[in-house]
């Protein structure tokens, strides 16, 4: 399996060379890929995983992600990295663009690493919401802000299809520091339309004359 991972690392270095010099090191039994000592991707069992971020949310809507997991004390831990499938490997321009999103988000997080706020200190953040975010690997304010409301909501919805639009509004409010009821009307409508676009519409047979 190591040989497969090394092949994937070398292929990633070739395809993503425009991002800069890509180095790798062992991490969690896998390999982290870095540019300027900033981790933006992982290679595990011969597969490349990109760091999820707000800008990659739309891609993950159209391509339901497979998340990177590893074992810790006998239980599976999910990381915020999604697998690059073969169709994405065949589209190098898109792969480079998504990888750049991941790198930029990682650099942004690195610049704010000196503060590690607790989720429970944010508006709209109930104990239950903090708990379910933790279950999908979102454990602090920095991760919430880097991923953005849409990506966090997608993570929750992938775990539980009954997650409502109200949770999306609560996440957005938590990120910008206001109660969900005080969200600007235009932003609330944009989020609602985005969430609605993900819900399959039920079709009814035409009525007979």
Curated annotation (Swiss-Prot):
Is the Transcription regulation keyword given for this protein? yes
Query: What InterPro entries does the entry give?
Result: TfoX-like, TfoX-like_gammaprotbact, TfoX_C, TfoX_N
Q: Which SUPFAM superfamilies match?
A: YgaC/TfoX-N like (SSF159894)
Q: What does induction of this protein depend on?
A: Not expressed by conditions that usually induce expression in other bacteria, such as amino acid starvation, antibiotics or addition of chitin. Induces its own transcription by a mechanism that requires CRP, cAMP and CRP-S site in its promoter. Negatively regulated at the post-translational level via degradation by Lon protease.
Gene deleted: what happens?
A: Reduces both natural plasmid transformation and competitive fitness in long-term culture.
* Keyword vocabulary terms for this entry: Activator, Competence, Transcription, Transcription regulation
Q: Which GO biological process annotations does it have?
A: DNA import into cell involved in transformation; establishment of competence for transformation; positive regulation of type IV pilus biogenesis; regulation of DNA-templated transcription
Query: So what does this one do?
Result: Induces low levels of natural DNA uptake by inducing transcription of the competence genes (the CRP-S regulon) required for DNA transformation. Induction of the CRP-S regulon also requires Sxy-activated promoter (CRP-S), cAMP receptor protein (CRP) and cAMP. Induces CRP-S site-containing genes which are involved in genome maintenance and transcription or encoding transposases and toxin-antitoxin pairs.
Other observations noted? Overproduction induces the expression of the competence regulon genes including ppdA, hofB and ssb, although to highly varying degrees. Plasmid-borne expression leads to production of type IV pilin (T4P), the main subunit of the DNA uptake machinery.
Q: Report the family membership.
A: Belongs to the Sxy/TfoX family.
Provide the protein name. Answer: Protein Sxy
């Amino acid at each position: 399996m190591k040989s497969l991972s090394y092949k994937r690392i070398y292929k990633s270095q070739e395809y993503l060379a425009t991002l800069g010099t890509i180095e790798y090191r062992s991490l969690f039994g896998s390999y982290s890929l870095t540019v300027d000592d900033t981790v933006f991707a992982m290679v595990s069992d011969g597969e490349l995983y990109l760091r999820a971020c707000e800008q990659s949310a739309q891609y993950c809507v159209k391509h339901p992600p497979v998340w990177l997991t590893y074992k810790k004390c006998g239980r599976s831990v999910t990381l915020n990295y999604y697998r690059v499938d073969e169709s994405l490997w065949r589209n190098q321009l898109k792969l480079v663009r998504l990888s750049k999103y991941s790198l930029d988000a990682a650099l942004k997080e690195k610049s704010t690493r000196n503060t590690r706020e607790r989720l429970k200190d944010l508006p709209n953040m109930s104990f239950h919401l903090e708990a379910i975010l933790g279950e999908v690997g979102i454990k602090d304010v920095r991760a919430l802000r880097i991923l953005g409301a849409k990506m966090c909501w997608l993570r929750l919805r992938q775990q539980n299809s009954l997650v409502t639009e109200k949770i999306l509004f609560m996440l957005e409010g938590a990120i910008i520091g206001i109660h969900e009821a005080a969200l600007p009307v235009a932003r609330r409508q944009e989020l609602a339309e985005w969430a609605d676009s993900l819900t399959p519409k039920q079709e009814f047979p035409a009525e007979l004359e």
